[in-house]
Amino acid sequence: MPRVASVAAVLAALLPSALGQANTSYVDYNHEANPDLFPQCVATIELSFPDCENGPLSKTLVCDKSARPHDRAAALVSMFTLEELVNNTGNTGTGVPRLGLPKYQVWSESLHGVYRANWASEGDYSWATSFPQPILTMAALNRTLIHQIGDILSTQARAFSNVGRYGLDTYAPNINSFRHPVWGRGQETPGEDAYYLASTYAYEYITGIQGGVDPETLKLVATAKHYAGYDIENWDGHSRLGNDMQITQQDLSEYYTPQFLVSARDAKVHSVMCSYNAVNGVPSCSNSFFLQTLLRETFGFVEDGYVSGDCGAVYNAFNPHEYAANESSASADSIRAGTDIDCGTSYQYHFTNAFDEGEISRQDIERGVIRLYTNLVRLGYFDGNSSQYRDLTWSDVQTTDAWNISHEAAVEGTVLLKNDGTLPLADSIRSVALIGPWANATTQMQGNYYGPAPYLTSPLAALEASDLDVHYAFGTNISSTTTAGFADALAAARKADAIIFAGGIDNTIEGEALDRMNITWPGNQLDLINQLSALGKPLVVLQMGGGQVDSSALKHNTNVSALLWGGYPGQSGGTALLDIIRGVRAPAGRLVTTQYPAGYATQFPAIDMGLRPNGTNPGQTYMWYTGTPVYEFGHGLFYTTFEAKRASTATNHSSFNIEDLLTAPHPGYAYPQLRPFLNFTAHITNTGRTTSDYTAMLFANTTAGPAPHPNKWLVGFDRLGALEPGASQTMTFPITIDNVARTDELGNRVLYPGRYELALNNERSVVLRFTLTGEKAVLMKWPLEKQEIPPAA
């Protein structure tokens, strides 16, 4: 992350004289993926609220609670001078002191906990709950859990904002899809599936954060990011700031934008962030096709929703993209294309010049600022203590309920990849050797984008608090090639009844601005695991980190008893992992990414955005991959056995006419394709001896429509809680018309006649077949890609 300047430096930088100065120092952003930003961009500031009782604004329309939010905001902005207007177009706005309008910081974060807050050094407001990274939370396959986390995050954020320590909007969630396994920021995402996983995560997180679906009073403004085609940091020297991603309209519609469609159309997100990269030659923040044609006209983005550029992305349209001739033109292009707020300083530095040159009008500038302040009106920013969430305090942050949810997410997301019966550990195991670079992890468990947590329970701390004897040895580092710690590790292992190795990857080799060049276990961790396995004792390996590594060697080593994937588990990570290992809880998570063999990472360039297989590309994601994975997308074992039987109300081999489906009444659904037309119902019985949750993924497949055909695609998931031995429950998946549509070469969503299958999990334990008849039908027409940046208004 960029360095954060002091508040004093920010205030000095925000003087109007400073904002009129241009940046003339250019960095080669084609190779530098994470340069420092200007101090006024990255600073945290003390939030304060306008005084609508006795302040200068008290008699103006913006303080009239009975007026429409847009009208209140427009009345406020109409009072700004041009200089004042320009000064409030960046993420760090100066406010308007003469009107009693405080400065405001748009840039706050809440990926998996409150972040970029004005933290107290100790005591109240010095920490917030740290949840697992989204990729682990998504592996739990629990919608309710995602929504709860969003709700808790916004409650804690509002408590911080009420005392001036946080803003009222947040740059989260990250809903890009984890397309290629080397991507450093995949840990921040819900996994590799765009259509169902990322879209569901987006919906639940956004509605949790914002306080519902477009509520009258917003709780917090969520920002769906990064729009669009952003999933490479610095792979092989390709900087995220200068990447020009070549994406077909088919892939753009099918894979890179459906989660943004759901965010805008269904969840009613109030902010979207355009990304650093270009797509098909046009930088995202200067892309009118993305920001107007798709987002507003096709996806139905809320009228007063605002688009924020990623931090520095407006400037990047000039350097390194060279799409604009200079920074002033880059700013003019971006505001007219639809980027309302610049997370950066380009707008503030260059709008006055662009206005003088006739490149933009006051109306162009006002549009984005009005949208921002309309949202602040809906957040209660101008409503004083009567605002719905102004009574939230520190007592709403320090709740054990939030801590319990964090622990639950870590438990539910943990995935059992391999087990020979060693797990859960038998009661006869009284001593354990804990070895490896994750064994004593604390902040390591938080991944990236994290703030101070109330506590961080490492695996070592959790074990030492148990009734087991613990023999700890570091063994080796994440990327170490020295064997200096091997002897101590082996000595500790010889003293113990069982061995736990905690390793994998972490933010030293994956993260923002940091991609991997391979997907092998780094350093000499596998060498140490192999030597430990030769001791012939029960050996449990914890594979940690967001991205997958090729664990073929562990899968096939019969002396490796069990393998768990634990992601970045957050503040309760050690306790959660120990609960799984000892059988206090049973694992039921499923992989939300494919674990590929190591050769996949070098088989084709990671910047190849094509999903479908071709002569050099074996296909990307579980939908299109033609090879054999180490562990499949959706893989996950249990401590018990389950039997799944079809109990569907729809008869197998049913037939549906396409025209009838689309012309049938659809009350409660804005679009006919969102109406369920059949239910897939499975009867699940715990046939084993251990109480366990049960998770399932439902996949569709067909040979209808044009080739190539996907292997399958996800149309549902669910989680049943705590099935006791012998107990049964049913899980029902409503199947919508859109669920079984495909995307044609033009990007249209099309329903094709033909035979279809719905299958439960990779094992296909329950299968339902049906046929669609009649003529194919376009469900959503993808617009023609063209750039039409309007002239200055």
Curated annotation (Swiss-Prot):
Its EC number is 3.2.1.37. The keyword Secreted applies. InterPro entries: BXL, Fn3-like, Glyco_hydro_3_C, Glyco_hydro_3_C_sf, Glyco_hydro_3_N, Glyco_hydro_3_N_sf, Glycoside_hydrolase_SF, Ig-like_fold. It catalyses: Hydrolysis of (1->4)-beta-D-xylans, to remove successive D-xylose residues from the non-reducing termini. One of its GO terms (cellular component) is extracellular region. The active site is at D310. Gene3D superfamilies: Glycoside hydrolase family 3 C-terminal domain (3.40.50.1700), Glycoside hydrolase, family 3, N-terminal domain (3.20.20.300), Immunoglobulins (2.60.40.10). One of its GO terms (molecular function) is alpha-L-arabinofuranosidase activity. It comes from the Eukaryota. Xylan 1,4-beta-xylosidase involved in the hydrolysis of xylan, a major structural heterogeneous polysaccharide found in plant biomass representing the second most abundant polysaccharide in the biosphere, after cellulose. Belongs to the glycosyl hydrolase 3 family. This is Probable exo-1,4-beta-xylosidase xlnD.
